[in-house]
Amino acid sequence: MSQTASNAIQPILNLQENCSNFYKKINEKYHEQMNCKQGCARCCFVNLSIFQAEAYRIIVWVLNLDAGKKKELLELLQKPMQSEEKNFQNKLASPCVFLRDNSCTIYEARPTICRTQGVPLQFKQVDKENNINITVDHCPLNFSDQDNFPNKNEWLDLDRLNTLQSIAENFFLKNQQKQDSQIQLAVDKNQRISLTSLKKEVIKILEKEE
């Protein structure tokens, strides 16, 4: 794997680190109002597709695991998936393909969206009169005490995050080398990668290294 390939994912690495730091800051201040903790996977019962840069970042992380960790990850991913459960919207849903025993098997390399779950997310909405309004959303398990809700400057701007994600993705697509890519077959018509497809690619890589 070339140095160019590593440089291509640097923007997404930086963005994900910033998201994790933002979450940590909010969680430290409002930990009594947040139910996010190891073992809670209510937000993990979703079917996601992610940017190619995010998927490639996961591939790079997998390749850099030591032999013991690779074997452990392969065994986990080959286990049967968890059963359907109610997600944070109280709807019955299938779990993420990387979830095992309510724990994320790729936690260190998890996608950006997974790093922002739990914190207040602000985004713009257009009403019937074409007025732009700022809306804030959060996990219904968190911040039940509205009198102690985070201040507006502590909300994560989802629109800005999406813009930064797109910039990181464009940088990746411009700078990656095709011969380095191990996930081309997983790209869908929208140029995104489903986690289901990515899991298959990860298993192939791990099986080749056994």
Locate predicted features.
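Short loop/turn segments that flank or connect secondary-structure elements
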Residues: 1-42, 46, 50-210
